[in-house]
Amino acid sequence: GMVMISVLNQLEAGGLEGLTRTSARYLHRRAEASRRAFLDRARWLGDPDFNDSIPLTRLLSKEYAATLVAATDSSKATSSLALGRDIITDRGESPQTTHFSVVDANGAAVSNTYTLESSYGSGVVVAGFLLNNEMGDFNKKPGYTSTRGDIGTPPNVIAPGKRMLSSMTPTIVARDGALVLVT
């Protein structure tokens, strides 16, 4: 949720008027906004029951989004190391996550994200589906770099009873009862 709101706030602050969805400038703005939102996610977010110092109000504010946009070069990608030398890695995309969005003829919508975390998940099958091993989404300890290249940030360090950070954001948007967007 926080990442999506941050990206939308940045896109609103930067303006998309006159840009087509396939233009280089449009795609550049979306990519740079996403990179900054995910950087803040990695740096600040974790289970809020265990992290009382998450600056969520600031991260979701339009003013903060405007500062992110102001620091973005509109003509070239920002170096990942310049954005967050302490937490940026290049792992590529996970092949174990599936997402689908469906809208039927009557406008009923479904948005579903299912992830295993790694190949074959936990290795346990129940009632016809695989159980995931999302424990891998926790950071092992602050500063620890996993074999996947994840760098541990304190808000998402593993602890009993804690919920791990997740990027899944299946979304359905309606305005005045009418479906507007499904992602």
PLM features per residue range, with description:
Residues 2:
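Flexible, polar/acidic helix-loop-strand segments at domain edges
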Residues 6:
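Protein kinase glycine-rich loop
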Residues 22-25, 160, 183:
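Short alpha-helix boundary/capping segments
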Residues 108-175, 179-181:
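Active-site rim segments in enzyme catalytic domains, especially the processed small/beta chain
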